[in-house]
Amino acid sequence: MTCYRGFLLGSCRRVAGGRAALRGSGSGADGRRHLGHGQPRELAGGGSPADGGFRPSRVVVVAKTTRYEFEQQRYRYAELSEEDLKQLLALKGSSYSGLLERHHIHTKNVEHIIDSLRDEGIEVRLVKRREYDEETVRWADAVIAAGGDGTMLLAASKVLDRLKPVIGVNTDPERSEGHLCLPVRYTHSFPEALRRFSRGEFRWLWRQRIRLYLEGTGINPTPVDLHEQQLSLNQHSRAFNIERAHDERSEASGPQLLPVRALNEVFIGESLSSRMPYCWAVAVDNLRRDIPNLKGLASYYEISVDDGPWEKQKSSGLNLCTGTGSKAWSFNINRVAAQAVEDVLHIARRQGNLTLPLNKDLVEKVTNEYNESLLYSPEEPKILFSIREPIANRVFSSSRQRCFSSKVCVRSRCWDACMVVDGGTSFEFNDGAIASMMINKEDELRTVILEQ
């Protein structure tokens, strides 16, 4: 169990404080790309002004699980000593001292956040992933994610109240980019951030999120926490069990609103494809060893965009992102390399008898302009869906490999598929299940913009 000064994780001890209110309103803004550390320059001038300031009376601090803590928990049943853990990590090529150093840096910065809040008379609860639940969110006036972007996604996942602010603080700027966090200067100067909050010297950023409905036959709306449990072998080998028991959920059910909102993205695909970008490599390696016939099945589904006609597709999966997520996995799925742009320009010049001057500057300019067109403001109420490696033949087609939309519906024809939300929460999504994804203003996430 990790100890922070004044707190013992698991006990959720509180620090007494005063009472205050939150004030503010939101409106839309455009943005382009992330630059530097912390919040992106694209947000400069964006968001909406704070109407006065805000000073929360009760704050929950969600601290990330460091790699050192993860390794400890991973082998907790073996009752390893610190020396045993050191030797085990060495066998895997990992540095025990390096992990411990990063852990201490994170812990020190979390303590700085807690002390800063306590000095302002604010009640604080410090929790880890396992203690972070709906009751804790209801108790708090604001949520602080102490870690990196992954911790910010975790903190946001439980907040369904659009008026409750969620603030990210990067606790290890040397190892974490922290796009969704405050600028890194506030990691060590958090009292200054609190003063600026109370004076209203910031802007609100209302990040759009995707809500999900699940309906059809054989659905299971129970979420699986990938970080805590890692998807079990039994769950994903079920489709290959010839003597599979009768599914009691075979009858069709109406639309059910799932208890999560996607801040970055939703990925839909066969389980191996859906897991690889998010889970630890060891889990994937274990699956491959235990189920050798699972070698990356193509995902088979039908898709309808903005209530249009259904289209059958096979691909490596489907990614649906928000403006926040357009800078993450979606960007890397769709971005083009300068080499590809140069080849296309060569062909265009040859086929069109053009006198286009092909030089490095032109190639770089065209490449950057195309890639920047893939990004859009976190406040824009639209979804960008992308088809990964679509299969095109006389049976299957992909009329739009990438497109903006307000609503996307997917009917699964998969055998062992998952619908993964922000890389941390998974839902079964097998044959007969239908997912509907859309943007709703009620799901906005209230975050802040602070200048450097």
Curated annotation (Swiss-Prot):
Gene from which this protein is expressed: Nadk2
Quaternary structure and partners: Homodimer.
GO terms for MF: ATP binding; NAD+ kinase activity; protein homodimerization activity
Positions of modified residues (Phosphoserine): 176, 377
Transit peptide range per the UniProt entry: 1-50
Protein's UniProt name: NAD kinase 2, mitochondrial
GO biological process: NAD metabolic process; NADP biosynthetic process
Region annotation Disordered: where it falls in the sequence: 23-52
